[in-house]
Amino acid sequence: QTDTDSNSEGDETPAEEDVNLQTLEISFDRTCQFACSYCNPAFSTSWVKDIKNNGRYEQLTSDGRNHFTHIHESSQLYGYQEDNPYIEAFWKWWESDLHKTLQELRVTGGEPLMSADMWKLFDWFKDNHGKSNMRLAINSNLGGKDALIDKLIQKAQHVEHFHLYTSCEAIFDQAEYIRDGLVWSTWTKNVDRVCAEGNLEGFHMMCTVNALCLFSLTDFLDYCLELKSKYGKDFPTFTLNILRFPSFQSPLIL
């Protein structure tokens, strides 16, 4: 999205004219300790490890995108110790003027908290207080150990407009089955911690409505209402997104 999108009807921006972005979503890498059932190797190194160790999934005739048959090497063009020209270009742009012109930067993954560049970004806000008034938003599975959540809470104190997005749509064993790697008690503890201590301007729950969550989805929404009563009506906001792919996990198959 650019700052010309809000122009009055009939205004036209010449194709050769430079424009400033209003929002930007980036992913530094796909490192992630979860292998959620509706995710795939393009967004999770845990999925990559599974397919490397156990081989491709066979006879998934309804997976039209073939996500589970290969490791999506094109999603990680550079190794973790290699210089990445795309990330270098981002930092050059960020330092020059992007931090002044953006309204929101949203960092996804993988799991952003496992990326060194995410912590570099947090440190930039600490070292450059007042230089940017933008919203910083991250997607996190909030499955990290105490030390990682401690670090997140500490770094978040230096971001004036910090928004955190996390994902879940079921409770207890059902949630752990759908989102492989999640420990329900750890996740709920971390949710409480970031809501109480994390200097959040916004906390958002993304629910992926799929065939495996329907029997406890309403219980999960009750949990969200309990959070609202504890931390305020907007903690969390939540969205209900109908899963379409992989189609064998769509609620429409039931």
What are these regions (language model features)?
Residues N7-E17, E82-S96, D146:
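A Trp-anchored, charged/polar loop motif used as the substrate-binding/catalytic surface
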Residues W124-G130, E197-G198:
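Short, acidic, metal-binding catalytic loop of nucleotide-sugar glycosyltransferases
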Residues W119-D123, D146-K155, S216-T218:
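Distinct, well-ordered alpha-helical segments
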Residues Q1-Q22, F34, Y38, A42-T45:
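Flexible, acidic/Gly-rich N-terminal and inter-domain linker regions that tether
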Residues A211-L227:
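Catalytic cores of alpha/beta
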Residues L24, F90-W93, L121, W187-N190, ...:
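Alpha-helical packing segments of well-folded alpha/beta enzyme cores
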Residues L21-T31, A42-Y86, K100-A116, N128-L148, ...:
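Core AdoMet radical
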